[in-house]
Each structure stands twice: as C-alpha cells, then as structure tokens.
Amino acid sequence: MERNSNKIVSSDNESLILVDKEDNEIGHLSKVECHKNEGVLHRAFSIFLFNDKGHLLIQKRSSQKKLWPLYWSNTCCSHPREGEDILDAAMRRLEDELGINGIHLEYLYKFSYQASYKDIGSENEMCSVFIGSINGDVIFNKNEIESIRFIDCESLEQEMHLNSDYTPWFKMEWRAIKEKHSMELEKYIKAFL
C-alpha cells in the first residue's frame, strides 16, 4: 500500500454547506469557520469499505489535521462542496484520498453530532453514512492520511474499547451500524456479528 502523490485535496477556505436539523441547505461557510469553537452544523459524509475477507479499511489521520490528528478513523470522511451532490463528493474524496474509484456505495443512514477536540475546535455535522466493498490496491494521499490498514471487526471492537485514539464520529457510526444496520453490515463482513 504505497503513498499517493502529495496532491492537495482540500483547504481551510473551501466553502461547506450549512444545514438545519432536517438537512435543508441554509447557506455556506468556509471550512475553518465551520470548525471553530462549538462548530456550525454542516453537511458531511462517512464511508466504510470492507475487503473480501470482511476486514474494514481504516485510516490514521495525518499529523497535519487540526482536529484529531493521528487518530484512527473510518475509511474516508469529508464534506461535499458547495453545489456538489453528497454521493459525488464521497466518490471524489475516495479517489483523492485513497486512489479508489468505480465502486458502489450503499447509503445506510444520516445523523447529526457535535464533538469538540481539546480547545482547538469542533465537528458539528449532519453526516450521511455509506458502506461498500473494495478489492485491489489502495494508494493513499500522504497529505490527508498518515497510514492505513485493514482490521477485522473483532479486533476493531477490542481496540475501540481499550484505546482512545479513535475519532468520536467513527465510534458513534460503528456502534449505530452494528446496532441498527446489522443486516447490511453482514453482507460485507459475513462471519462476525
């Protein structure tokens, strides 16, 4: 699993989509402003990709990230840009971060959450969660990702229980997937539940 180029795929000044509690678009604001203090509710997505062994691809966030640097997180998470469909944004980001394209993503659910990181800033997101499968090589972007690995679900459960170096949204999403979307999850992991 080689590192991809050092292509810059986002900036603090990019315009994110502000939403209300029903995910209706209500405006736009720069990424840096959306993440200040308690954060401003904005649209986001998270992706969970499994290989043919039922192992989840997870990433360690870059040391350059302002929020939760060097924490383990799900396969990919980001924001659609102004005027961009959420599924198009998810596919764009998979290619930009991991060199993955041409796969099918299944929509699971949407939820909102707020989480603060030290006194640096917060996520305050209306997040759509997708699941899918991956076969083939993954080439990650070193500006976005420190490292990647595949992990089986049982090991992930143990690590999340013992270690605090997992992003809060990853923990929330994983719990919801197991508890409320086990039928969909079973298609991808086959053996573990």
Map each language-model feature to its residues.
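Short glycine-enriched loop/turn motifs at secondary-structure junctions
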Residues: 10, 73-74, 140-144
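Acidic, metal-coordinating catalytic segment for phosphate/diphosphate chemistry
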Residues: 2-46, 50-52
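Short, Lys/Arg-enriched, disordered terminal segments
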Residues: 1-12, 183-193
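Nudix hydrolase/Nudix homology domain
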Residues: 33, 82, 109-114, 121-193
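The catalytic Nudix box helix
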Residues: 57-58, 75-108, 130
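A short, polar/proline- and glycine-enriched secondary-structure boundary/capping micro-motif
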Residues: 37-39, 67-72, 149-152
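A glycine-rich, hydrophobic loop/mini-helix early in the fold
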Residues: 44-77
